[in-house]
Amino acid sequence: MSTKMTGSVKWFNETKGFGFLTQDNGGNDVFVHFNSIQSEGFKTLAEGQRVSFIVEQGKKGPQASNVVAL
């Protein structure tokens, strides 16, 4: 079962459509792809923005899914 986490955006590159999130619990930074952002229209995140997300195992390591701006 996946656990909902909270954290903030470390950085996000709008042009490339990916970035990294910092977990509030102090865990490793988590990769985030724009396809995982739950919003309407242009999907992007701002540095320092608060988010909730689920950490899943991606092909290259931990990856965020179901990312929602708080």
Curated annotation (Swiss-Prot):
<dbReference type="Pfam" id="PF00313">
    <property type="entry name" value="CSD"/>
</dbReference>
<keyword id="KW-0804">Transcription</keyword>
<dbReference type="GO" id="GO:0003676">
    <property type="term" value="F:nucleic acid binding"/>
</dbReference>
<protein>
    <recommendedName>
        <fullName>Cold shock protein CspV</fullName>
    </recommendedName>
</protein>
<dbReference type="InterPro" id="IPR012340">
    <property type="entry name" value="NA-bd_OB-fold"/>
</dbReference>
<keyword id="KW-0346">Stress response</keyword>
<dbReference type="GO" id="GO:0010468">
    <property type="term" value="P:regulation of gene expression"/>
</dbReference>
<dbReference type="InterPro" id="IPR002059">
    <property type="entry name" value="CSP_DNA-bd"/>
</dbReference>
<dbReference type="InterPro" id="IPR011129">
    <property type="entry name" value="CSD"/>
</dbReference>
<dbReference type="InterPro" id="IPR050181">
    <property type="entry name" value="Cold_shock_domain"/>
</dbReference>
<keyword id="KW-0805">Transcription regulation</keyword>
<feature type="domain" description="CSD">
    <location>
        <begin position="7"/>
        <end position="67"/>
    </location>
</feature>
<dbReference type="InterPro" id="IPR012156">
    <property type="entry name" value="Cold_shock_CspA"/>
</dbReference>
<keyword id="KW-0010">Activator</keyword>
<keyword id="KW-0238">DNA-binding</keyword>
<dbReference type="GO" id="GO:0005829">
    <property type="term" value="C:cytosol"/>
</dbReference>
<keyword id="KW-0963">Cytoplasm</keyword>
<dbReference type="GO" id="GO:0003677">
    <property type="term" value="F:DNA binding"/>
</dbReference>
